[in-house]
Amino acid sequence: MEPPAGAAATVKDPDHDPVKTKVSAPAADPKPRTSSQKAGHSLQDWDTIATVGTGTFGRVNLVKEKTGRQYCALKIMSIPDVIRLKQEQHVQNEKAVLKEINHPFLIKLLWTGHDNRFLYMLMEFVPGGELFTYLRNRGRFSSVASVFYATEIVCAIEYLHSKEIVYRDLKPENILLDREGHIKLTDFGFAKKLVDRTWTLCGTPEYLAPEVIQSKGHGRAVDWWALGILIFEMLSGFPPFFDDNPFGIYQKILACKIDFPRQLDFTSKDLIKKLLVVDRTRRLGNMKNGAEDIKRHRWFRGVEWESVPQRKLKPPIVPKLSGDGDISNFETYPESELDKTPSVSDKDLETFKNF
């Protein structure tokens, strides 16, 4: 089986010297409105150091406390773009979910606010960079490394599900490594509190579960499907279903014909097959015993699950860092053009009055 074109694309080497680029922050409202104001958390208290991530309607900046030594990540979202792309509910969902969760493997939200152009979310800075970068630089992970990351992810997803939250965007790009090498799930824009099944088509094509594609309504089971895709990708270096266009990917997902690379052993393949079951009622993790069925699978043999959330397992990769504000494990980005973002009317701003 050949990986998709570009699967081993060159990405930034995490071992080079940290970038010291100084970028300008957007010219914000001098008195941004905040809905979760805490002492020491306002835009005026932070200096922007560099951009460490970009998205469809904003970016994430590394910021440093002016009067102290704390570094944080500031997510800045353009309100006009959020409105244009009809992402208001996703943004509100992200804030609501982040306010509710507290887990060692999930990113922490510290503060939110807005002015008449931007929404702001101040979060802990996780300096190790994306798991995606390490996976692409190495080609694929060993079985030992894959078990470690899957173990911490299972605990994180199980916790979210216990809170009636479905994550819906599990992929290597959304898994950060902290300074010790433990994971932090980030980007909760697609996360949703479950009251009943949901029908929204969202997520990354290669990781979408069949029931999402078929608009049958979906719940927790989509996260366990994505875990199966992730385990396959960690062990092989590429996802099991790929094509030049999303519709081709969707067709392959629905057919669910998995071509396993030769290096995958029987136990790995058995777990992946049980996670990548089109019928969600038979999918591992979504049956009567829930996540316990996954934990008991022999691929995880030897894992002391009670020690996992205590961060007692030894990480296979420890990020190289020169200091607290080291951004060498992240891509470099061009200087921000956020100052060109127009302001919005009071009517449009009403949607975000409690943000």
From Swiss-Prot:
Transmembrane segments: none annotated. One of its GO terms (biological process) is regulation of cell migration. Widely expressed. Keywords: Acetylation, Angiogenesis, ATP-binding, cAMP, Cytoplasm, Developmental protein, Differentiation, Kinase, Nucleotide-binding, Nucleus, Phosphoprotein, Serine/threonine-protein kinase, Transferase. Binding of cAMP to the PRKAR1A or PRKAR1B regulatory subunits induces dissociation of the holoenzyme heterotetramer. The released monomeric PRKX is then active and able to phosphorylate its substrates. The keyword Acyltransferase does not apply. ATP binds at V52, G53, T54, G55, T56, F57, G58, R59, V60, K75. The modification N-acetylmethionine is found at M1. PROSITE patterns: AGC_KINASE_CTER, PROTEIN_KINASE_ATP, PROTEIN_KINASE_DOM, PROTEIN_KINASE_ST. It is found in: Cytoplasm; Nucleus. The active site is at D169 (proton acceptor). The modification Phosphothreonine is found at T200. Residues 301-355 form the AGC-kinase C-terminal domain. Residues 337-355 have a biased composition (Basic and acidic residues). It comes from the Eukaryota. Belongs to the protein kinase superfamily. AGC Ser/Thr protein kinase family. cAMP subfamily. Serine/threonine protein kinase regulated by and mediating cAMP signaling in cells. Acts through phosphorylation of downstream targets that may include CREB, SMAD6 and PKD1 and has multiple functions in cellular differentiation and epithelial morphogenesis. Regulates myeloid cell differentiation through SMAD6 phosphorylation. Involved in nephrogenesis by stimulating renal epithelial cell migration and tubulogenesis. Also involved in angiogenesis through stimulation of endothelial cell proliferation, migration and vascular-like structure formation. This is cAMP-dependent protein kinase catalytic subunit PRKX. It comes from Mus musculus. The lineage of its organism: Eukaryota, Metazoa, Chordata, Craniata, Vertebrata. The gene is Prkx.
